[in-house]
Amino acid sequence: MASEYLEHKLALLPGLPGCYLMKNINSQIIYVGKAKNLKNRVRSYFKSSHTGKTAQLVSEIVDFETIITSTDKEAFLLEITLIQKHQPYFNIKLKRGTGYPYIKITNERDPQLLLVSDIRKDGAYYFGPYPNVYAAEETMHFLQKVYPLRRCPGHQGRPCLYYHMGQCLGACFKEVPEAEYDQQIRKIKSFLNGNVGHAKKDLTQRMEKAAADMAYERAGDLRDQIRYIEATVEKQKIISNDSTPRDIFNFYLDKGWLSIQVFFIRQARLMKREKRLFPVVNSAEEELASFIVQFYQRKNTVLPREILVPASIDHDVIEELLKVPVRTPQRGTKRDLLEMAGKNAKLVLEEKFRLLELDEGKTTGAMKEITDALGIAPGHKIEAFDHSHIQGADLVSAMVVFVDGQPNKKLYRKYKLQTVDHADETASTLEVIRRRYGRLLKEHAPMPDLILMDGGDIQMNAVKEVLEDEFDLHIPVAGMVKNDHHKTADLLFGPDDHHVHLDPKSQGFYLVQRIQDEVHRFAISFHRQVHTKHSLSSRLDRIPGVGPKTRNKLLRKFGSTKKISEASMAEIRELGISEAVARTIHVTLAAETAEIKNPRTPTSL
């Protein structure tokens, strides 16, 4: 059964081909699919009965997003790109990182391939942006195997491990001719610009030769590299055979709001997109021209070889400022892509307008219901607190902020408790309230209109003690009460901590429920991070030869003991760790993992 919010969105779906992205309660994309008719396909998830994995997927969907395309074929190709980009749980279980990194070929005598997020004017060659770290790493590792440059610090007097693996040209122990580097770099650039035919042909010839020489392991590696090209490059093209890196901008204007869509075309495929919505003062054309120029003035943004815009945009001004050709395609695939960006801009804006009324009830309207029920002045900002610990260990507190009924995650705060060493609601509350509002007073920052505590009268009285007696602040404080089923029930408020009832079907009740769930989630999540870090540190500290510096290196690189135990000796030694210590780490963690998987049965007396 779809929620009221989803029912509104389902009613807005177009009967066009495209892709849909299902999201869970944390706004994570958990599934990407395609459809000839988005309206029929997406509605089928919520209007039909399901079993197994589909039923599990539907139970986790709280929101969705769509991208319309011109044809079903485009939808199919775009689906592949989106799955590769987002790594959704219900498509592929592998998830590795976020962000938009670039592959860099350094400008050195012995150049190397690197993954970077900072773009500098250092004469290096940058290719990207990639949709995520996973996609960039896969591409870079492929290039390091097929077209190696330097993969070691260099000049160490002996061949490095990567040289023996065929992934380094040998700057570690000899002088590599510049011509050899130049040849490799030309091949790398050609591949990154979408010209993969030569690489595939070369790999096929090498695979056949290795098989003929009965070097079957090497032939298998080469076969996997060919499959990488087929799976992640060739199948991800979106119609065009033109590999020119280009960005496409289009817009839709209505009721004083401008919707902008940006498509990033790299290696002849839609690498990623950005969408923006904001109210405008000038004409849409002027606003878009200004937006484009500012867009490329941001840090770590590489200019494409070509920018496509609608005909109404002033090409000359943008070209002059950015020194990049700006064109309006008249026919063919490029015109289709420009129109696709415009259609998506329109769809996003129309959806916003139709959801505004519903959103208003859930945000500012819900906030007013709460303040009216408490009998306090109307306000905008709520701050809520919760504590978390395990048997009095690793005590933490967390605060979430909701403004006009919406979470503002930039204002969230985490607190490691410093004066409390055991489970004590009063002491924990006193410390976190002193730290939070003492800081706001010192910085002359605005105070919230309401404070909510995920607890009863003990926490509320502690808050009032600090605010009123120590800081002379008079901020309304209420406690969020749960019923026997651990669900939001009422609010506690006033000098006598009386129960304030909220209609369970009201938006105000839903907002309190959201705040209570969110602050609990945030506190639990932070506690797990702290507890896991302490647990990891203690496990590593017990290994002979591992001191604080080595421990921190390992945690920064791998993040968990599981990943450390799965790492090769070479990967551990890359951190500057000696072979003996690396071997001890590897053996110790492997033994611990084996003990967890196959615990010994106690012997009977």
UniProtKB/Swiss-Prot annotation:
Tell me yes or no: is Nucleotide-binding among this UniProt entry's keywords.
no
Where's it found, cell-wise?
Answer: Cytoplasm
Domain UVR positions: 197-232
Q: Which UniProt keywords apply?
A: Cytoplasm, DNA damage, DNA excision, DNA repair, Excision nuclease, SOS response
UniProt record, GO biological process: nucleotide-excision repair; SOS response
Instruction: Note the Gene3D superfamilies from the entry.
Output: 5' to 3' exonuclease, C-terminal subdomain (1.10.150.20), GIY-YIG endonuclease (3.40.1440.10), UVR domain (4.10.860.10), UvrC, RNAse H endonuclease domain (3.30.420.340)
Q: What is its main location?
A: cytoplasm
Q: What does this protein do?
A: The UvrABC repair system catalyzes the recognition and processing of DNA lesions. UvrC both incises the 5' and 3' sides of the lesion. The N-terminal half is responsible for the 3' incision and the C-terminal half is responsible for the 5' incision.
* NCBIfam families linked: uvrC
What protein does this entry describe? UvrABC system protein C
The gene designation is uvrC
